[in-house]
Each structure stands twice: as C-alpha cells, then as structure tokens.
C-alpha cells in the first residue's frame, strides 16, 4: 500500500509555475518536458553532490538496537535509544539556522561531521559501558544537526543554480530526488545490516552471541558512520555553491524583472 500511496501522490501532483513569454527551454514558453529537466540536472554538478550527501547521511545503521540487546544486555534500552536520537535533534535544530547562516552550509556541516566521527569512535573506550554508548549517540546526533538543517537549503540553492545555468527550474524533481535517495539509502542500510550479521554467524535463536558477532555489531556501529563522514566530507569539498548563491540569486532576480 505504501508504494501505491507514493505513486498516487506523485501521479496527482501538478506543479504550477508562473511563466512569461520567453521562459522555459530555449525561449519556449509553457510546460517543460520531464526529459529536459533531467538533461539540465545531469549537467548540474551540485545536484549530484546533494544526492550523494543525502544518500550518505541516511546510510546510518540500525545496529544500536542489537548493541543494546546483545552487548549491553538490555533490550528495554531500545526505546531510550530512540529518545537519545530524537531529543538532541529537536533541541538543536532551532540553533542550526543561525549557525549555518553565520558559517555557511558547507562549513557548518563539515564542523558537525567532526563530531559525528568523534562520537562514533568514542564507543571504543568501552563498548559495554551504557554511559559511553549513550554519550556516543548524543554526540553523533548533535554533529549531524548542521547537515540535516543545511541539506534542504542546499537543494533550494541547486534549483536556483540550475535555473541560472540552463533556464530550467526543476523544484519538484530536485526535492523529490533527494527524498528518493534518502529512502534508497535507508533500504541499503537495512540490507547491509542483514548481510554483515549473516557473515558474522549471527543466529537469533541463540541465547548468547559469538565474539565474532558482537565484534561485527560494534564495528558496524562505529565504522559505517565514520565511512559516511569521509564520503560526505569529500562531497562537501567540491560543494562551493555557497560562494555563488548571492550572485546567482541577484542575476535571476534581474532576469525576472
């Protein structure tokens, strides 16, 4: 039903844009074919970068629940883990806007990624220590706040840059493709957990997990986020649109007069 719901929403959603004669592709007014949108976006490197950032951001792993049950020995902690994940985000997001405005989307996100890496590696201090585990989660979530806050704004900048560069404004496709990459990443993450646990010899029917399985859980919890931090940092290195946003916005405004 969920895939059908997404398709129904997509099929019955129509974007309405005010256009003047001469707007569109090569001066053609009216509706722009979907193919022209994708052709324009394919040449927009910032679109590809934000897709990669969305994918990497959401390739987090759900290994925390396994660690709570099999490493910390308390499956009742799963609900508390959820709170430790959500509360920092709720508290921190209102502060992310001024931070991003002050230092820029890329720089604020880069700084946050350092915290994500530190928070992940913190688990190695003592993987079986409850407080170390929760501090790790909280530090990671605080670190990811700037990126979470910046990505939607980055997508908006990608739309503006695309219109400035090619004359094609693709709001709907840019934002929906970001959402799609997020969902694909979450699916890949879930599948990866199953593959890793299977390779480590995980057996849900056993009361005690093997040392190899426990090690796989801990290492996945730590190294998958660290690897994604490296990927996101590399993508952000090439994301220099922050420096061009004002110029792009100004020229677009002049064209629309």
Where are these regions (language model features)?
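Intracellular loop-helix junctions on the cytosolic face of multi-pass helical membrane proteins
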Residues: 1-65, 69-74, 220, 225-257
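Loop-to-transmembrane helix entry
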Residues: 64, 70-88, 210-220
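Residue-level signature of mid-helix packing/kink "hotspots" within the transmembrane helices
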Residues: 86-94, 187
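Helix-to-loop junctions at the C-terminal end of transmembrane segments
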Residues: 91-105
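Structural signature of the two symmetry-related core transmembrane helices
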Residues: 107-122
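Helix-loop junctions at membrane interfaces in 12-TM secondary transporters
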Residues: 124-137, 147
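A late C-terminal transmembrane helix in Major Facilitator Superfamily
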Residues: 166-201
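A membrane-interface helix-boundary motif in multi-pass transporters
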Residues: 195-227
């Amino acid at each position: 039903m969920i895939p059908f719901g997404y398709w129904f929403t997509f099929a019955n959603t129509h974007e309405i844009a005010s256009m003047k004669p001469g707007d569109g592709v090569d001066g053609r007014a009216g509706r722009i074919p979907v193919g022209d949108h994708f052709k324009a976006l394919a040449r927009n490197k910032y679109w590809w970068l934000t897709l990669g950032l969305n994918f990497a951001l959401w390739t987090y792993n759900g290994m925390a629940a396994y660690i709570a049950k099999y490493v910390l020995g308390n499956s009742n902690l799963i609900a508390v883990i959820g709170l430790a994940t959500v509360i920092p985000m709720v508290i921190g997001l209102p502060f992310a806007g001024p931070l991003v405005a002050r230092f820029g989307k890329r720089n604020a996100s880069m700084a946050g990624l350092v915290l994500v890496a530190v928070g992940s590696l913190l688990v190695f201090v003592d993987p079986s220590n409850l407080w170390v585990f929760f501090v790790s989660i909280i530090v990671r979530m605080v670190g990811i706040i700037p990126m979470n806050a910046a990505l939607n704004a980055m997508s908006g900048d990608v739309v503006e840059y695309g219109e400035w560069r090619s004359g094609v404004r693709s709001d709907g496709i840019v934002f929906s493709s970001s959402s799609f990459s997020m969902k694909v990443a979450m699916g890949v993450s879930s599948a990866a957990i199953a593959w890793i646990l299977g390779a480590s010899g995980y057996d849900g029917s056993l009361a005690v997990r093997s040392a190899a399985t426990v090690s796989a859980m801990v290492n996945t919890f730590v190294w998958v986020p660290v690897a994604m931090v490296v990927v996101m940092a590399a993508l952000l290195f090439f994301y220099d649109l922050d420096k061009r946003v004002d110029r792009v916005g100004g020229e677009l405004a002049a064209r629309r007069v």
